[in-house]
């Protein structure tokens, strides 16, 4: 019994003028996802995916490289205006926003959406270095 060849679907190129850049900056990594207004992902990049491993992932430079990669992919989809939403306490917060701005994208607003507990779960113990 011969197998029929699977139909190859051509990837539909999205053309979106406005987008939202979600920057998730943890202590260990930085994840940048650029979505349209409805929340559908257009492009994404991480510090680890940009070639940084171990403790180098948690540097501002790694976040900058990841933001440039995500931004260039989003520009191919036609994104020109961005709204930035930052979540997390990581070191890559500022540099990711600066990298997106340096690509020539117009940033309309920067919002910090870091979740803050109203006395919820007990936090992890303090680090002793």
UniProtKB/Swiss-Prot annotation:
Protein name, as recorded: Small ribosomal subunit protein uS11
Molecular function terms from GO: rRNA binding; structural constituent of ribosome
Function of the molecule: Located on the platform of the 30S subunit, it bridges several disparate RNA helices of the 16S rRNA. Forms part of the Shine-Dalgarno cleft in the 70S ribosome.
Family membership: Belongs to the universal ribosomal protein uS11 family.
Pfam families, per the entry: Ribosomal_S11
Keyword tags: Ribonucleoprotein, Ribosomal protein, RNA-binding, rRNA-binding
Gene source species: Aromatoleum aromaticum (strain DSM 19018 / LMG 30748 / EbN1) (Azoarcus sp. (strain EbN1))
GO BP term (any one): translation
Upper taxonomic lineage: Bacteria, Pseudomonadati, Pseudomonadota, Betaproteobacteria, Rhodocyclales
């Amino acid at each position: 019994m011969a197998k029929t060849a699977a139909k190859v679907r051509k990837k539909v190129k999205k053309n979106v003028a406005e987008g939202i850049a979600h920057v998730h900056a943890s202590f260990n990594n930085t994840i940048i996802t650029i979505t349209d207004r409805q929340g559908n992902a257009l492009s994404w990049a991480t510090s680890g995916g940009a070639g940084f491993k171990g403790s180098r992932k948690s540097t501002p430079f790694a976040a900058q490289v990841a933001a440039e990669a995500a931004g260039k992919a989003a520009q191919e989809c036609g994104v020109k205006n961005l709204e930035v939403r930052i979540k997390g306490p990581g070191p890559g917060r500022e540099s990711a926003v600066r990298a997106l701005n340096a690509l020539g994208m117009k940033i309309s607003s920067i919002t910090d959406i870091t979740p803050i507990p109203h006395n919820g779960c007990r936090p992890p113990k303090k680090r002793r270095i």
